[in-house]
């Protein structure tokens, strides 16, 4: 049985009640997202609260951690309460579509999401895990429409998605007036094609700066660039 919690340098994330556990995608999103000058941050689909906690560690912004699943929201709230930043992070248990419609007068400097990514794969009997993994609960179109309503004029939206969804996601984003400014191609082992990508979007059309990140040089041996990006979080970096 896997550990029921993951220990970081400044906080602990319990994930035994959450469908999706602490993983590389969330850590990369929390470490790579630009948060300079952010006063208000929205984390869509916070799960365990990992990304919200990482962003709170990196800046002094107030953070809304939004989660549709009640059990996950409760565990996120517990993780956040135990952290040094409990007073700056609020967990809201609500469907993002409802939240974006009711709160479109609120604007966020930074919005992040590690959205569900399976579109047509077979589902498992666990409804909580299906919600966390399958995007029929929140499509990319619905996600990006809501983001365009809530993002401040000079704000940044950063997302982690499968590499094969990158082009279609950018097309949908552009239909909502959002354009890529930075893109990170994540390579898990030398010589392999990227399977994940992180993209930052703004309302400003510009050249997109593309970067590559190799996470491991061999099994359980992290690359220097991955260590540099995540050393403020992982215990043994």
Curated annotation (Swiss-Prot):
<keyword id="KW-0963">Cytoplasm</keyword>
<keyword id="KW-0819">tRNA processing</keyword>
<dbReference type="GO" id="GO:0032259">
    <property type="term" value="P:methylation"/>
</dbReference>
<dbReference type="GO" id="GO:0016430">
    <property type="term" value="F:tRNA (adenine-N6)-methyltransferase activity"/>
</dbReference>
<dbReference type="GO" id="GO:0008033">
    <property type="term" value="P:tRNA processing"/>
</dbReference>
<keyword id="KW-0949">S-adenosyl-L-methionine</keyword>
<dbReference type="GO" id="GO:0003676">
    <property type="term" value="F:nucleic acid binding"/>
</dbReference>
<dbReference type="InterPro" id="IPR007848">
    <property type="entry name" value="Small_mtfrase_dom"/>
</dbReference>
<comment type="function">
    <text>Specifically methylates the adenine in position 37 of tRNA(1)(Val) (anticodon cmo5UAC).</text>
</comment>
<protein>
    <recommendedName>
        <fullName>tRNA1(Val) (adenine(37)-N6)-methyltransferase</fullName>
        <ecNumber>2.1.1.223</ecNumber>
    </recommendedName>
</protein>
<keyword id="KW-0808">Transferase</keyword>
<comment type="similarity">
    <text>Belongs to the methyltransferase superfamily. tRNA (adenine-N(6)-)-methyltransferase family.</text>
</comment>
<dbReference type="GO" id="GO:0005737">
    <property type="term" value="C:cytoplasm"/>
</dbReference>
<dbReference type="InterPro" id="IPR029063">
    <property type="entry name" value="SAM-dependent_MTases_sf"/>
</dbReference>
<dbReference type="Pfam" id="PF05175">
    <property type="entry name" value="MTS"/>
</dbReference>
<dbReference type="InterPro" id="IPR022882">
    <property type="entry name" value="tRNA_adenine-N6_MeTrfase"/>
</dbReference>
<keyword id="KW-0489">Methyltransferase</keyword>
<dbReference type="InterPro" id="IPR050210">
    <property type="entry name" value="tRNA_Adenine-N(6)_MTase"/>
</dbReference>
<dbReference type="InterPro" id="IPR002052">
    <property type="entry name" value="DNA_methylase_N6_adenine_CS"/>
</dbReference>
């Amino acid at each position: 049985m896997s550990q029921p919690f993951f220990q970081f340098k400044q906080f602990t994330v319990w994930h035994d009640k959450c469908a999706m556990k602490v993983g590389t995608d969330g850590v990369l999103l929390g470490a790579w997202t630009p948060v300079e000058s952010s006063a208000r941050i929205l984390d869509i689909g916070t799960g365990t609260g990992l990304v919200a906690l990482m962003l709170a560690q990196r800046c002094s912004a107030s953070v809304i951690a939004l989660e549709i699943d009640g059990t996950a929201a409760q565990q996120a709230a517990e993780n956040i309460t135990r952290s040094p930043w409990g007073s700056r992070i609020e967990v809201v248990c609500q469907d993002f579509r409802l939240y974006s419609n009711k709160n479109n007068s609120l604007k966020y400097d930074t919005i992040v999401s590690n959205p569900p990514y399976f579109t047509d794969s077979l589902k498992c009997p666990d409804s909580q895990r299906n919600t966390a993994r399958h995007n029929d609960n929140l499509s990319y179109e619905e996600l990006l429409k809501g983001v365009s309503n809530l993002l401040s004029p000079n704000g940044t939206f950063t997302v982690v998605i499968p590499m094969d969804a990158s082009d279609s996601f950018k097309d949908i984003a552009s239909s909502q007036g959002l354009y890529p400014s930075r893109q990170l191609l994540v390579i898990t082992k030398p010589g392999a094609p990227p399977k994940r990508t992180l993209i930052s979007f703004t309302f400003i059309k510009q050249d997109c700066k593309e970067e590559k990140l190799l996470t491991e040089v061999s099994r359980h041996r992290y690359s220097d660039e991955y260590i540099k990006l995540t050393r403020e979080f992982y215990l043994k970096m």
